[in-house]
Structure formats: structure tokens, C-alpha cells
């Protein structure tokens, strides 16, 4: 309303899409922008605040939304960075021009041309059942899987509208890689992973120990190549009877010249992945994770033909970082606090356990052990937690198939991704309706993991940031969540189009899903069509109504 403060455009678009137009936000936002432009309408219906474009075809800003500075933005080739580090030292309530390539909702590189530091605002953290987290303002939109009249649909929901047991979409397309990584960076990544898991670095000495001689030799050679300082190597038999290989040095002068020095004096409970590793390409991160898992990781065969790959640490931040980096490679894991006081990152789904060695793997003998476990297990049974909620019910209800095909669809598991990867063509052959086939194919192509929301919690007032992305939906990835930026309110003339609408002046009918009512026409005391004109495509013809004085 004109007498009230401006509202976030994201909120208006989300409410319109949720109540009246479940077909994407782009057309809604484009309409809102046009109604705020005095060069597009003789009498604008929206009072916009912010960048709504210009007569010279300067595009409008995206709908403003905000996440906290620690959110990791995905970049091409497996790189990522904190959104607060895009423009170091950006002032609160500032717009900063940038030239940055980020990944969109499909995992494709797109241009981001501006960083917004939106000041300090109240924030909320969305946490999934697996442990994935993102923190943002109440009006920050995330891509969610929503049941729209029985149809599972990808829609934007504001954080304030997200509740436990909702489903958010996590982007998990493996990164595109361009050639081998820099040799020196790779060796530093190997050392970092090895020393975080099984080493120590202090002001006066550094050391690393491992039972696998071949892996130990690889780490020692990497140390010589990167650090190049004098070090000692010795072996000793430990209590278990195994032979432990140890690298030790009391001269850390050369070590201080490498990026390994960043973990100096770090307590085990305070360990984390340094920022330079997040900025590294996928090939470097892979070597880091291989060393990390070879040290404190494990794999084991479990009852009922199941498997578990896990990483244990006493550092909550390191567990979060490991889970996030696994997601960057498309591997879904679960993070939790074990009764013993350790944080565990575990991979238990068969498909994810098979993906782990393909995308990452262990750095030494544990990789051979994992290969043996997988080879000894029967073929994947096709059922795990990786599924599309509501898809099976939707297909069975709307497939429009013969009774024999309907019976087949009711008997078989048709909402789990493992089944679609293996038998997708067979499932589609039993679905007659082409629209149902299209929806099912789109939701099961593997781009997204549909994670159940466990909680939405108050995280207090924090500095928040946003990016302007040059695409139709303005989407980019933050901690794997798909994030979707302006403020607006109605003008007095627009209120004349709505006056007395709640006094039975027009007829109302149910909306598309029957949850709310929508008017068949607006009262419109202000003759908008005559004053502002309109243009569009009718049935097979173009129509234009010019504005009149």
C-alpha cells in the first residue's frame, strides 16, 4: 500500500507465484518491473525503490535478498569462495561492481556483475536432516520442491515460509574440469590433507605419521618438493603391533614459506579448511580430500548388504567443511555428533558410496579396501534415501496409462533416483501422458538432491550480502542451496484498481490448487487499459491497445 513502507520484491513475487501463478518467477518479476517504469507506463502502478532499469535498456536489478558472509558461492571448475570475500572490505549498504563467473541453478557458468553489502539484518539458518546449512534473511528465496495441487514442482520459497519437513533443492552437479591442476598446488593440497588428519605443526616442530608405507612415502616426497627442508624419518612398532612411519622436523623455517603454515598451532577441535583450498580447482580439492580420508577416514561393510564410508573429527567446522566439499563433487553425505564426542561425516547410500571412489576416493591402501567391499556386494537394490518426494504418487495418479501399466507403476519403486538411473527408460514406457513424462524426467535428471528441512532457527542480526546475476532467474549457489534481488509498493492509482474488492463488488473463484480465492476481474475505478495500453499475443495474432488521453 502507498502509505506503508516498501516490501521486498522477492516477497511479492513469491506470494504471487505461490497463490496465482505456479509457472516460474521470471514473468512475474518482469511484469512488476514494467509497472514501475514511467517510460513503460504513462501512469505507473508500482512505486519501485532501487534499480528498475532505464530507458536506455539498462536492465533492472535482481530481487534483493541476502545471505551471511560465510556462505560459499560456487564458481566454475570446482572453485568456491565466501560471498563476503568477493569484494574484501565492502562497506555496509553499498553496491560494488564485480566481474565474476558463478554457477547457476543448473551448474552452468554465468556472469555476476555486482555485490551488494546490505548491512546488518535479522537472519535465520535453514538446516537439513543431513546437516547442510545456509543462513540468510527472512526474505531470502531458496529453491524448494513443493507439492502444487499434487504436482511436485520446483518453486522459490522465502526462508520465512520454509518449515521443517519442507524439501529444499541442493545442487550436486560434479564440477567441470579443464586439464590437470598445478603440480605445486596439488602437492600442497596433499600435505594439507595429510597434516590435518595425522600431523601437527607448531612454532618449533612439525610431524606426520601413518601406517601405510606407500602413502607415507608419497607424503614425504611431497614434503620434500614443497618445503624442501631437512627432516627425519623413522619407524616404530605401536601397541597394536603395526609398524608406524613418522616424518619429523625441528626446523620449520622453510615450512613457514608454504601455505601449510596456516595450520600452525591449530587445536584439533578448531581445525577447518583454509580459504585457499576453497579457491582451488576441483583437481586440487580432490587430492586434499583423498589425503584427509586416508588419514581419518574409513570404510566398512555393514549388515544387510550396506556400506559406510565415514570421516571422523573432533572439529565441528572441519566436519561441515568436509561435507560441503563432498557436495561440490556431487557426493551426498550425512553429518552428526557421535556419542563419543566426535563429529562424523558418513556416506551410507549405495549409489553415493559408488560415486565416492569415482569422484574422490581414498589416497592410499583404503581405496583398495573400498574397491574390494563394493565388488563383493550384490548389485544395487535400487532403493535409498535419494528420491523425489511425491513423484510416485503424482505419476500413478496422472499417468493416463492402460490398467496394465498402472498396475506396473503401483508395484514398482518409481521415485528413487537409483531406480531411474538404472531403469528410467522402462519406467517412462509405462507412462502415457507426455506432460507427466516431462515432469518426471526433469525431476530425476540428478542435478538436485531433495533434502528434507530439519529446522529453521533464529541466528540473530548479522551482516548480509547478495549478488546480481545476469540471468532470467538471477540464481546462484550458496552452500549448495539454490539462491534466487529490489523493493516495491503499489501506487495510489493501483489502489484505485483494487478499491472495494473485498466488498463483494466482483466474483471470486478458487485458485489453481483450491487453497485460496482469486477475483475473476478487478473493480478498476482507474481505467488502466485505456490509460496505459497493452500489447501481447492472442490466439494466432498480435494485439495492441494504444494508450488514450
From Swiss-Prot:
Keyword terms, alphabetized = ATP-binding, Autocatalytic cleavage, Cytoplasm, DNA-binding, Isomerase, Nucleotide-binding, Protein splicing, Topoisomerase
One Gene Ontology cellular component annotation held by this UniProt entry: cytoplasm
Where found in the cell? Answer: Cytoplasm
- Please list the residue ranges annotated as the DOD-type homing endonuclease domain: 191-331
User: Record keywords: Iron-sulfur included?
Assistant: no
- Alphabetized Pfam families for the sequence: DNA_topoisoIV (PF00521), LAGLIDADG_3 (PF14528)
Nucleotide-binding: is it a keyword of this entry? Answer: yes
Provide the reaction this enzyme catalyses.
ATP-dependent breakage, passage and rejoining of double-stranded DNA
Q: What is the predominant subcellular site recorded for this chain?
A: cytoplasm
Q: What does this protein do?
A: A type II topoisomerase that negatively supercoils closed circular double-stranded (ds) DNA in an ATP-dependent manner to modulate DNA topology and maintain chromosomes in an underwound state. Negative supercoiling favors strand separation, and DNA replication, transcription, recombination and repair, all of which involve strand separation. Also able to catalyze the interconversion of other topological isomers of dsDNA rings, including catenanes and knotted rings. Type II topoisomerases break and join 2 DNA strands simultaneously in an ATP-dependent manner.
- Any additional notes? Few gyrases are as efficient as E.coli at forming negative supercoils. Not all organisms have 2 type II topoisomerases; in organisms with a single type II topoisomerase this enzyme also has to decatenate newly replicated chromosomes.
Q: How does it assemble?
A: Heterotetramer, composed of two GyrA and two GyrB chains. In the heterotetramer, GyrA contains the active site tyrosine that forms a transient covalent intermediate with DNA, while GyrB binds cofactors and catalyzes ATP hydrolysis.
Q: What is this protein called?
A: DNA gyrase subunit A
Give the species this sequence originates from: Mycobacterium kansasii
Q: What is the lineage of its organism?
A: Bacteria, Bacillati, Actinomycetota, Actinomycetes, Mycobacteriales
Amino acid at each position: 500500500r502507498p502509505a506503508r513502507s516498501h516490501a521486498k520484491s522477492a516477497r511479492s513475487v513469491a506470494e504471487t507465484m505461490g497463490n496465482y501463478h505456479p509457472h516460474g518467477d521470471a514473468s512475474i518479476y518482469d511484469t512488476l518491473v514494467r509497472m514501475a517504469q514511467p517510460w513503460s507506463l504513462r501512469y505507473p502502478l508500482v512505486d519501485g525503490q532501487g534499480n528498475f532499469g532505464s530507458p536506455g535498456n539498462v536492465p533492472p536489478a535482481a530481487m534483493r535478498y541476502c545471505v551471511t558472509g560465510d556462505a560459499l558461492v560456487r564458481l566454475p571448475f570446482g572453485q568456491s569462495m565466501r560471498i563476503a570475500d568477493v569484494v574484501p572490505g565492502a562497506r555496509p549498504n553499498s553496491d560494488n561492481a564485480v566481474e565474476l563467473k558463478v554457477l547457476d541453478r543448473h551448474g552452468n557458468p554465468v556472469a555476476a556483475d555486482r555485490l551488494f553489502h546490505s548491512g546488518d539484518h535479522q537472519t535465520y539458518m535453514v538446516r537439513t536432516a543431513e546437516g547442510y546449512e545456509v543462513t540468510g534473511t527472512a526474505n531470502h528465496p531458496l529453491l524448494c520442491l513443493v507439492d502444487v495441487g499434487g504436482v511436485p514442482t520446483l518453486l522459490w520459497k522465502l526462508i520465512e515460509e520454509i518449515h521443517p519437513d519442507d524439501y529444499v533443492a541442493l545442487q550436486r552437479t560434479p564440477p567441470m574440469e579443464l586439464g590437470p591442476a598445478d603440480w605445486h598446488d596439488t602437492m600442497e593440497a596433499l600435505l594439507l590433507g595429510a597434516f590435518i588428519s595425522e600431523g601437527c605443526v607448531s612454532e618449533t616442530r612439525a610431524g606426520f605419521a601413518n601406517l601405510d608405507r606407500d602413502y607415507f612415502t608419497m607424503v614425504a616426497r611431497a614434503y620434500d618438493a614443497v618445503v624442501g627442508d631437512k627432516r627425519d624419518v623413522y619407524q616404530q612398532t605401536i601397541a597394536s603391533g603395526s609398524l608406524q612411519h613418522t616424518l619429523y622436523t625441528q626446523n620449520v623455517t622453510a615450512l613457514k614459506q608454504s601455505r601449510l603454515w596456516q595450520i600452525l598451532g591449530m587445536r584439533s577441535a578448531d581445525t577447518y579448511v583454509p580459504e585457499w583450498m576453497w579457491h582451488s580447482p576441483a583437481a586440487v580439492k580432490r587430492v586434499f580430500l583423498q589425503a584427509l580420508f586416508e588419514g581419518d577416514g574409513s570404510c566398512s561393510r555393514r549388515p544387510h548388504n550396506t556400506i559406510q564410508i565415514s570421516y571422523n573429527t573432533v572439529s565441528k567446522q572441519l566436519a561441515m567443511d568436509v561435507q560441503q566439499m563432498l557436495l561440490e563433487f556431487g557426493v551426498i553425505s550425512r553429518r552428526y555428533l557421535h556419542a563419543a564426542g566426535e563429529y562424523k561425516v558418513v556416506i551410507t547410500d549405495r549409489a553415493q558410496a559408488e560415486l565416492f571412489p569415482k569422484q574422490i576416493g581414498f589416497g592410499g591402501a583404503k581405496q583398495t579396501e573400498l574397491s574390494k567391499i563394493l565388488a563383493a556386494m550384490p548389485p544395487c537394490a535400487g532403493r535409498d534415501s535419494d528420491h523425489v518426494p511425491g513423484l510416485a504418487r503424482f505419476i500413478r495418479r496422472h499417468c493416463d496409462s492402460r490398467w496394465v501399466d498402472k498396475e506396473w507403476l503401483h508395484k514398482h519403486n518409481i521415485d528413487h533416483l537409483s531406480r531411474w538411473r538404472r531403469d528410467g527408460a522402462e519406467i517412462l514406457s509405462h507412462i502415457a501422458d507426455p506432460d507427466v513424462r516431462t515432469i518426471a524426467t526433469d525431476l530425476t535428471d540428478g542435478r538436485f538432491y531433495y533434502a528434507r528441512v530439519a529446522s529453521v532457527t533464529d541466528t540473530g542480526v548479522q551482516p548480509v550480502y547478495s549478488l546480481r546475476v545476469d540471468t532470467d532467474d538471477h540464481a546462484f549457489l550458496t552452500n549448495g542451496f539454490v539462491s534466487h534481488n529490489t523493493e516495491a509498493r503499489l501506487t495510489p492509482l493501483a489502489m484505485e484498481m483494487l478499491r472495494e474488492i473485498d466488498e463483494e463488488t466482483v466474483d471470486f473463484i478458487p485458485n489453481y490448487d483450491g487453497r485460496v480465492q482469486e477475483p475473476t476481474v478487478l473493480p478498476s475505478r482507474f481505467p488502466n487499459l485505456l490509460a496505459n495500453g497493452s500489447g501481447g499475443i492472442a490466439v494466432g495474432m498480435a494485439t495492441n491497445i494504444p494508450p488514450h488521453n
